[in-house]
Amino acid sequence: MSSGNAKIGHRAPQFKATAVMPDGQFKDISLADYKGKYVVFFFYPLDFTFVCPTEIIAFSDRAEEFKKLNCQVIGASVDSHFCHLAWINTPKKQGGLGPMNIPLISDPKRTIAQDYGVLKADEGISFRGLFIIDDKGILRQITINDLPVGRSVDETLRLVQAFQFTDKHGEVCPAGWKPGSDTIKPDVQKSKEYFSKQK
């Protein structure tokens, strides 16, 4: 795995690449296009594989929930945009993706994967990296899975909601926090209000 330039609390590495858009067209997109929005940017190893379609379809199926949070989901792999399109045009029952609600970026030179520190150099593919970038372009969360295990859309959605809550209210979110749950005031005295309610 490459070290990359992606660091929590710093600007997310910029990228510009060709993507297959939800309407099936090719378009060059960049991270800068989504300024003012949260972005969930995830890498997957390869098109036409086994775990990857389950993750991509799960994120695509729930794209509207992210959109309601002013958050854009973007997928990326080292495959060409032509390969992405062929996979999208393959029926789900045959291992394809079917119609997508999110853009899929092509990173054939592996520069984006390298910048984000997810390149598995010996195979020339990406680990399952997931990055939450806030509306100011700051990287707030990084997870990188080894190849065999997929990621949770529910947990990603929860993290976006939690970061947005802390941005807006200045309070911090305890383990397992969900919208509507108690939060903690980041102050020695005021935090006792939260802890006094715990069993």
UniProtKB/Swiss-Prot annotation:
Residues 184-199 have a biased composition (Basic and acidic residues). It holds the Pfam family AhpC-TSA. Residues 176-199 are annotated as: Disordered. Transmembrane segments: none annotated. SUPFAM superfamilies: Thioredoxin-like. The modification N-acetylserine is found at S2. Phosphorylated on Thr-90 during the M-phase, which leads to a decrease in enzymatic activity. Acetylation increases reducing activity and resistance to superoxidation. Deacetylated by HDAC6 which decreases reducing activity. The modification Phosphothreonine is found at T90. The active site is at C52. GO terms for cellular component: cytosol; nucleus. It catalyses: a hydroperoxide + [thioredoxin]-dithiol = an alcohol + [thioredoxin]-disulfide + H2O. The keyword Oxidoreductase applies. It comes from the Eukaryota. There is a cross-link at K7, K120 (Glycyl lysine isopeptide (Lys-Gly) (interchain with G-Cter in SUMO2)). The keyword Heme does not apply. The modification N6-acetyllysine is found at K7, K16, K27, K35, K136, K197. This is Peroxiredoxin-1. It comes from Bos taurus. The lineage of its organism: Eukaryota, Metazoa, Chordata, Craniata, Vertebrata. The gene is PRDX1.
